[in-house]
């Protein structure tokens, strides 16, 4: 057995043991740990930023691009936000132990579902060290143990944050092994983590498409994931023109890099001649490059031609594919073929069209008269989220605390027997 395998197995064994204690942990103890972590982060800001400086120095030497350097940096503001996030999660209701509706059977037996932790969650992520705190806090609050494997470029930052998390757990008399940070940058550690079915119950990958595609191929442990966010907005013939303009503009320009950003705009042919030029003008003035079908190009002179590849691309930048469609059916066919199952929206005042779209578009989130950038756990009232899932099994859409739990059936009787 290699040293990496031994390291990972030890982490797994410790996490499994800690998960049993976390399953029993009270909401009060979990909240005490979270609040202790918040204080420790503020008090330890100088040490955190010193560790972060080591990562930044190495990243600059390796030519890391400015946008990624920004994500890696633990500024005063980001440290404050991590502490605030911990306090917010402490204030959320604890899902563990909650009971669903109770059904009383004809023999008087009472049947219900109880929320319980998943067990041990492996989380694999890139660049942003704040994910260490977000992920640890959500797993802790939902009664799970977790093994965190961050990007190699953030190793010093992640280890420093992991030490704070473990100190917070200890302060609340919870097992420090409930949150462990992988201390090696060897990629073999990831390969081992996603195959440890005896110790890990689920993997949550947060990163680029390449990372998630690789894990989907290699993993033997179930994944909660989304591969990409190729999101669509369809402007129906019955759309309010001003509302359509505002929604399309916000869906693309709110933040290019979020996974809910609109990547393809579909416009009904009946309103395309009047609506598309208005939307195109606003987006072009904002610096967005448009790539359209032949009908779109005829309506907006100078628009670049879209290739077939554009329809399936998550740009995460100031580029938008545009297509004029014959009707609602063609719009939904386009989404079914090219969409990623993440988030898709219709703009319409036609109730029947809205209901059909929500019923028939098979995405984890389907909107009516809203921009796709609302794809976020806070916006859904879930509080913090661990990520967004396009899976059909278990969690789907933004995954908050409840998504990090499962259920068991609990039955109560008075001595009934089965005849």
From Swiss-Prot:
Q: The organism sits in which domain of life?
A: Bacteria
A Gene Ontology molecular function term for this protein is: glutamate-5-semialdehyde dehydrogenase activity
Q: EC number(s) of the enzyme?
A: 1.2.1.41
Q: Coiled-coil ranges per the record?
A: none
Subcellular location(s) per record: Cytoplasm
A single GO BP annotation from the record? L-proline biosynthetic process
The UniProt entry, under CDD domains, shows: ALDH_F18-19_ProA-GPR
Q: Which pathway does the protein contribute to?
A: Amino-acid biosynthesis; L-proline biosynthesis; L-glutamate 5-semialdehyde from L-glutamate: step 2/2
InterPro entries in alphabetical order: Ald_DH/histidinol_DH (IPR016161), Ald_DH_C (IPR016163), Ald_DH_N (IPR016162), Aldehyde_DH_dom (IPR015590), G-glutamylP_reductase_CS (IPR020593), Glu-5-SA_DH (IPR012134), GPR_dom (IPR000965)
* Chief location: cytoplasm
Q: Which PROSITE patterns match?
A: PROA
- Keyword RNA-binding carried by entry: no
Sorted UniProt keywords: Amino-acid biosynthesis, Cytoplasm, NADP, Oxidoreductase, Proline biosynthesis
What reaction does this catalyse?
L-glutamate 5-semialdehyde + phosphate + NADP(+) = L-glutamyl 5-phosphate + NADPH + H(+)
Keyword Acetylation part of the UniProt annotation: no
| One Gene Ontology cellular component | cytoplasm
Give the record's family classification: Belongs to the gamma-glutamyl phosphate reductase family.
Main function? Catalyzes the NADPH-dependent reduction of L-glutamate 5-phosphate into L-glutamate 5-semialdehyde and phosphate. The product spontaneously undergoes cyclization to form 1-pyrroline-5-carboxylate.
- What is the recorded name of this protein? Gamma-glutamyl phosphate reductase
| The species this protein was found in | Bordetella avium (strain 197N)
Q: Which gene encodes it?
A: proA
């Amino acid at each position: 057995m290699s040293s990496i395998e031994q390291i990972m197995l030890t982490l797994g064994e410790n996490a499994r043991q800690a998960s049993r204690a976390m399953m029993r942990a009270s909401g009060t103890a979990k909240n005490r740990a979270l609040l202790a972590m918040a204080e420790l982060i503020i008090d330890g800001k100088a040490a955190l930023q010193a560790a972060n400086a080591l990562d930044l120095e190495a990243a600059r030497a390796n030519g890391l691009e400015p946008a990624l350097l920004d994500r890696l940096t633990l500024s005063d503001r980001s440290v404050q936000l991590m502490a605030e996030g911990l306090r917010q999660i402490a204030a959320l209701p604890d899902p563990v132990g909650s009971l669903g509706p109770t059904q009383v059977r004809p023999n008087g037996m009472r049947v219900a579902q109880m929320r319980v932790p998943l067990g041990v969650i492996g989380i694999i992520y890139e660049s942003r060290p704040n994910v260490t705190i977000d992920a640890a806090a959500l797993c802790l609050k939902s009664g799970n143990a977790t093994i965190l494997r961050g990007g190699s470029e953030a190793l010093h930052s992640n280890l420093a944050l992991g030490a704070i998390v473990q100190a917070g757990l200890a302060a609340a008399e919870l097992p420090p092994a409930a949150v462990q940070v992988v201390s090696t940058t060897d990629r073999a550690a990831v390969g081992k983590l996603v195959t440890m079915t005896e110790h890990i119950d689920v993997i949550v990958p947060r990163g680029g498409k390449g990372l998630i595609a690789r894990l989907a191929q290699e993993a033997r442990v179930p994944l909660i994931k989304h591969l990409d966010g190729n999101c669509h907005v369809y402007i129906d013939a019955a759309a309010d023109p001003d509302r359509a303009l505002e929604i399309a503009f916000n869906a693309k320009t709110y933040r290019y890099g979020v996974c809910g950003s609109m990547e393809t705009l579909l416009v009904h042919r009946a309103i395309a001649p009047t609506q598309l030029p208005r939307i195109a003008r606003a987006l072009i003035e904002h610096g967005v490059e448009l790539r359209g079908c032949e009908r779109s190009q005829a309506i907006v002179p100078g628009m670049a031609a879209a290739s077939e590849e554009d329809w399936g691309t998550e740009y995460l930048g100031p580029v938008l594919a545009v297509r004029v469609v014959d009707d609602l059916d063609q719009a939904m066919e386009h989404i079914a073929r090219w969409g990623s199952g993440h988030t898709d929206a219709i703009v319409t005042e036609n109730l029947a069209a809205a209901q059909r779209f929500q019923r028939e578009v098979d995405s984890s989130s389907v909107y009516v008269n809203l921009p796709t950038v609302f794809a976020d756990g806070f916006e859904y009232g879930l509080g913090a989220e661990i990520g967004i899932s396009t899976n059909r099994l278990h969690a789907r859409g933004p995954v908050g605390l409840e998504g990090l739990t499962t259920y068991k059936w609990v039955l109560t009787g008075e001595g009934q027997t089965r005849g």
